[in-house]
Amino acid sequence: HEKDVSVRFVDKAENIGKPDLIIIKKKKNTIGDLIFLGERDISKEILKLSRHGMMIIGICGGYQMLGRQINDPDHVESPNDGIHGLGLLDIVTTFSREKQTYQVKARMLEHGHLFPVDNELAGYEIHMGETTHNGHNSIRPFARITERAGKMVDILDGCVSASGNVIGTYIH
């Protein structure tokens, strides 16, 4: 417990206020959660705050929501073939039926405004699908996974926007 830290869950745009940071995560399913954010105008508020430099972090499904598009060709989460994301990161996610679950260790590559470069991170990945970007310089990888399920690897994870205030990662 940190004395100067408080966390709030928000279900309406007007309840966001002026936080130091917004964390977006998946609650039930990514597409349904993205629809929920749109129906409650939370998406619009997140976009507005991002334009003003607010730190936005998307974890797992939240990372996927930050992208341009989520494709669901096998209808894993939805009867729809896909949905437009928030567009804060130039990435596209395509769902698959296979769930990936791994314990991981990683090193930070980009700090945005919060994380020291080369800081070690331990956590886990649990997601369905693959996220790709178009290779433009508008985003940079967030971390380098060095160990996955007890095996040494060299895998880039997540991304940081060019402005440094939007970060996405699969690492919980």
Name the predicted role of every residue range.
Residues 28-122:
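Cysteine-nucleophile active-site neighborhood
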Residues 14-16, 93, 130:
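Residue-level detector of flexible, active-site-proximal loop/helix-junction positions
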Residues 7, 12, 103-171:
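C-terminal and late-domain segments of enzyme folds
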Residues 1, 31, 160:
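RNA-binding accessory domains that recognize and position tRNA/RNA substrates
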Residues 2-18:
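A short, well-structured beta->alpha microelement
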